[in-house]
Curated annotation (Swiss-Prot):
Binding site residues for orotate: F34, F35, S127, R155
Record text on subunit structure and interactions: Homodimer.
NCBIfam families per UniProt: pyrE
InterPro entries, per the entry: OPRT (IPR023031), Or_phspho_trans_dom (IPR004467), PRibTrfase_dom (IPR000836), PRTase-like (IPR029057)
MF terms in GO: magnesium ion binding; orotate phosphoribosyltransferase activity
Spans traversing the lipid bilayer: none
UniProt protein name: Orotate phosphoribosyltransferase
CC cofactor: Mg(2+)
Gene that encodes it: pyrE
Keyword terms of this UniProt record: Glycosyltransferase, Magnesium, Pyrimidine biosynthesis, Transferase
Amino acid sequence: MSDFRKEFIEFAIGRNVLCFGEFQTKAGRISPYFFNAGLFNDGESLGKLGQFYAKAILAAQLPFDMLFGPAYKGIPLVSSIAIALADGGNNYPFCFNRKEAKDHGEGGNLVGAPLAGRVLIVDDVISAGTSVRESVEYIHAAGATPAGVAIALDRMERGKGELSAVQEVRCMYGIPVTSIVNLENIVDYLREQGNLAHHLPAVEEYRARYSSRMVEPIECGGGTPRAG
């Protein structure tokens, strides 16, 4: 695990963004961990979060021309990521959408740089994939191309089918998805931390029960995903 990924997990735990215990998910599952990126809610934590995203994006070597953050959570994210990338000498334009169209001033649903070229979507997590779908629609409508998605946490958890939400996005849109950390990173971290090791059995049991059973790389389109 890269140093910045371990540092991000420690940062998230320190901000109570990543917690361990018993939590009910929207799907009705009892999860042994909970991730709430909304608690990165001050200037210092948002600035650090943008730096972690920037490191993950650069480490993934994704080719892109600009950033897009879907409303609402993506708005502060895309701003902080653009600043962090620029601080490292990588200056990219960015854009985000409004939930409601504006009929005065500049008007429309989009704010920021015009959507053009290869667009990297940024969000906190991918659950149902709704914000990614809406983002892709905005990008295509502008004549631009989705280049990929960057998220904070990949839960690696399947929905109703055998694929995880991230794998579904990869298959549906044919674009890469990168994350600062994933569930495997969290498991590895717990194994190394004596003071948190008591949470490991529950997390491993949850992973075994709900993680995607598809073998990476996933064969999409003409191929058939293979169960592992």
